[in-house]
Structures are given as C-alpha cells and as structure tokens.
From Swiss-Prot:
Organism: Coccidioides immitis (strain RS)
A GO term from the CC aspect: nucleus
Name by which UniProt lists this protein: Nascent polypeptide-associated complex subunit beta
Protein function: Component of the nascent polypeptide-associated complex (NAC), a dynamic component of the ribosomal exit tunnel, protecting the emerging polypeptides from interaction with other cytoplasmic proteins to ensure appropriate nascent protein targeting. The NAC complex also promotes mitochondrial protein import by enhancing productive ribosome interactions with the outer mitochondrial membrane and blocks the inappropriate interaction of ribosomes translating non-secretory nascent polypeptides with translocation sites in the membrane of the endoplasmic reticulum.
Basic and acidic residues compositional bias, start-end: 125-135
Amino acid sequence: MDQAKLARLQQSVRIGTGKGTPRRKTKKVHKSSGTDDKKLQTSLKKLNVQPIQAIEEVNMFKEDGNVIHFAAPKVQASVPSNTFAIYGNGEEKELTELVPGILNQLGPDSLASLRKLAESYQNMQKKEGEAKKEGEEDDEDIPDLVGETFESKVE
C-alpha cells in the first residue's frame, strides 16, 4: 500500500491534536443527601407533628390554573402551630386532567378558573369548527365522481 495514502488515512482518523485523546466529561449524579431530610424531621419533631392516616390524594391549586397532585402522600400535621408536611412525588397537572374527581374539592377561586377553562375550551371548539368549514370550501374544487369511474371521466 502507498505510504502517502496510508499517512493521509491515519491523519483523518486521529481524534485529538495534542497528546492522546481528550478526557471525556461524564455526568455525575448527585445523590440527595439525607442530612436535609434529617434536619427537616428534627424540626418537625420539635413542632410535635402527628401523622395523619387515610389520605388518598392532595391537590394544590396554583394561580396559573395548574394543579400539583400528590397521589397517596404521607401527611404530618401540627394543628396548634398551623403546620402541615406532605411527602410524596408531586406531579404538575392541568385542571382538565383531574376534573371528574376534583369537583367537590374546588373552592370559589378554583371554580372561577374552571369557568375560564370551559370558556376557552368552547372558543377552541368554535375555532376548530370554523377551520373545518374553511377546509370544506377547498373540497369544492375537486369534482365528485358519483356512479362513474375515473377512467370513464378522463375519456
């Protein structure tokens, strides 16, 4: 094999310009330290919190209309100090995802946001209906072939 051709191939394959190859950067996964959780537990013990059993779900309503939903959370409460601690994986969901089972939990503010949501949904339906009507107008340019085949129409 030609030495010049071999040298060109080796040069094109070489990755780094300096000695060796560059170091690869790896993502380090930081484990959540248990010290924060322990500090939180000790401060809650000072408040004399008691666990509350049989809570199926917790929903926190945000001002933008979304809901933070906790399914089967662990809840601890201290009524004299007006402190509630909720543990679990919270998911941010839209109000529409939780509507059937959440209606009895809605307060006056949330009902107003639900009305706004319903109005915006109706407006979207109207806009989609108008878009479909406009789409039907485009179909008028295409001739209808009722009872005939395409070949007979062309001939």
